[in-house]
Amino acid sequence: MIDETVLFTTSIDLSNHPMINAKIKLKKQYYLVLKYFVKKQLDNKYTNSRLIQYKEKFFNRIEIMEEESQIKNIIKALINSRFKPWKKKYKYWIMCDVALILMNDELIDKTALEMKKYMSQRQQKQFDILLNALKDNNVDISSIIFAEELMTQYRENRRFKEIKMHKYIVTANMSAGKSTLINALVGKPLLKMSQEVCTSNLCYLYNKPYEDERVHLQNIDFTNNATEKDLRNISWKTKTSIASYFRGIDDIKSHICIIDTPGVNYVLNQKHGKISQEILQQEEYEKIIYILNANKLGTDEEINYLKWISENLSKEKVIFVLNKLDEFRIAYDDIFMSINNVKKDLIIMGFENPVICPISAYFALLIKMKANGYELTDDEIDEYLFYIKKFRKKEYDFSKYYQSVYLEDGDNEIVEMSKKCGLYGLEKMLLGGII
């Protein structure tokens, strides 16, 4: 059975593919053989989009003359060319590419069996080294080292699909900073941030095993190379799925799905709260990330929603993220006292030992964008510098509210500020899997 989530979350980086610098004629042959083996096993939107990715990388805008009638001869020429020994590498690369695109053991094995029909027994024996190496990282690949880069990509995708997926569902009242927090955790601006409600349906954000500079988007249509414009113009009339590599302060090896739900207090559309409640009761997840706006605590809608969660869901699954504490003024507001008061209120509502994580989601996002090489606007640069100055004051050091998060002398600016604004602790708790 085909697991479409695996296909949706696979990473493939073709920037160093060994065929990029080959002659056009040879690349055409290679592509046609790859296309033949892939489509014979699985012909759907995911495999077709991958073939387009290869085509664009190999040829840019050059059109390929289809030669399907000659495909058997082309396969034989590439896979079993006895008089051109330098071509022996191609069958290994093709097999790796097929494996990366299909990500299914049964289909990969079927492809391997067909490819072997074009090989001598000696070639088949050597080819088995690759097939075993794709399944076992301990296999010696010194004799096929030329395929190491593609094998490494497949192995990492295989590792990723075999580990448990951790699902976290995010809920909040409008203007709590939900999209900003999610973007900060993901490490890139995938979700639109606005004071007005954007999310009127569910959005599933999946991480990928490694960075391949591609964002997968399933909305009305599917693309494995979504642009910023595509992400801005998402239709919230249907469920949305996005897959991208999550850029953490440290490398993220966990398999994560973050479920974004509609804001629950949008008066112009009463169904938003109902959608959130239904998904909270029906979806499987490990933790609920409930975002509180530190500037709007104690509203009737907030209290009613928290009571509903306390009465209908597992209270042990809830993590409270207290956002926008950076907007407090030290001369008038006491952050420590505010956090304690929130804790007391939550205990009264039935949350016996609430986990409260203070954070500045917007500063966290600026930190991630700067760390990951995004070009900040002049205003964002000014804001970043302002936050640096603010969070160097001891009153705004949120690291003390997280277990096992300590400032160290060797911390660079990014790490220091991520600890102080709460990002580092929350990220370790969620994406590091230490809840």
Predicted region positions:
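Globular "head" domains of long coiled-coil molecular machines
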Residues: 4-22, 155-400, 418-424, 428-433
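Generic surface-pattern signal
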Residues: 67, 80-84, 103, 132, ...
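Alpha-solenoid helical-repeat scaffolds
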Residues: 65-69, 120, 312-315
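Charged, amphipathic alpha-helical linker segments immediately N-terminal to NTP-binding catalytic cores
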Residues: 73-147
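Short loop/turn motifs at secondary-structure boundaries
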Residues: 404-415
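N-terminal accessory targeting/assembly segments
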Residues: 1-81, 85
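Short, surface-exposed alpha-helical recognition segments that flank or form part
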Residues: 142-145, 414-421
